[in-house]
């Protein structure tokens, strides 16, 4: 599964109300993603504070400890929100572990990069994670409820990737895969089939289901 290497892109955090508010998802889903992003933001701000404190003390980062910290805290948050990452949404457990490993790897490799432990980075991670989780759970819920078709939607602005622009309004059977550049995806933000960073990071596309 491809991992979103946020620090390798020129991504700038956008206020959550604007970031999600401009998307064509339902108002209830916008609110859910905003609340989810706020919780993820809090988690990573705490993480970055702990990492910064370790560095100030001259300690070498305990990679396993911090990866486990992210994984445990993230799963606790999902449980609090009633999101089942074991049976209903099994991809989440894999995603969380790999995302945690990638975030800590970046911090280990770039100890002098202040952005690695910044509030802006926490927001960028939160925005991407909230959309990834939102798109995945909406897809799985649509499958479970008997929906049979899905339509790819974009923001229709200059920030939309060319490979995503080509998919605007495309409707296909729900279990078929969208051809997105060099990759295949079940829905926007889907990395379960190996989609690369260039097709997922900062993406605000969404699917509708019928």
Residue locations for each model-derived region?
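N-terminal leader/targeting and assembly helices and adjacent pre-domain segments
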Residues: 1-148, 208-210
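Acidic, glycine-rich two-metal-ion catalytic cores of nucleic acid-processing enzymes
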Residues: 120-210
